[in-house]
């Protein structure tokens, strides 16, 4: 990252404290019970997932957590940092899209957001790994790293059908995980988690062999469990801007990432088999059933071959020790424009090996303090 890990430690602690990260709200859903059962029977790694929730009921309603916590128990950005900002006097403007950063004498001087014009001594960009590089490019920045090195954690899912009802849309969002294959190829392996499988998610992920087959699979939804296979990708994509200035994304799964994903898919199938699934299949366009191993050529990733999901986006305006290596310096500041700081996942120099939420917020916390020090 370009700074000592000891510098980041206090910010990691501050973020975890503000978000209320704990392992006291980890009652496993039926999905997670099956994940844990399969892992334990195989003798593989399994652990409780730390979660940023306070007062979570860990019951039926928690399955909709990804759509917004109905109880307000999830300590999201809205319930933490935005509340803190508002209490400190910040004005929060919604419905206004930043079109470009205003620059004067080589330094950030504000933001053009169409009907809203902001004048400031510094600008912090935190628009995500797609919109951040697009904003920088629209603002006239030309560092060659802007838009490059986009990582996605391009994952997939493996399904298991059980005799008992799983009701996979219910229960704690994610209570268990496994790092059994996390350290493949120097830390570029996969993680296993479960996710609440609502009908809309399943419709996008299930294989298609025709209307009758699809109807049968959807009717079996109460008996299905899904294991998400989330890799750390070495390959990368790119964000450019079109004629209208909007982002255009290209990404091709690297062969080495596809190979590791295959290992992860086989492992997920073994977990489901050990947990007692009587049918196991992938999210490929052609239904691929697992019977002690998929056919060697059955699980190749290519155009129209299977469903992949971009779990976490990062890296498209990465930090580096010089303009040749990164779009911004280790403090997140642009090499081209003073007091223009990137504070989101696009600043990651490589893909993270875990969910990047805490790391994103910790780097933003650290670099916000550095920026404040320069401005005072």
Protein language model regions, located:
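Conserved redox-cofactor binding core of oxidoreductases
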Residues: 1-98, 280-307
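Glycine-rich loop(s) and the adjacent beta-strand/alpha-helix scaffold that form part
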Residues: 4, 87, 96, 101, ...
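A glycine-rich dinucleotide-binding beta-alpha-beta segment and adjacent secondary-structure elements
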Residues: 55, 61-67, 99-102, 272, ...
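A conserved FAD-binding loop/helix module that cradles the flavin
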Residues: 350-371
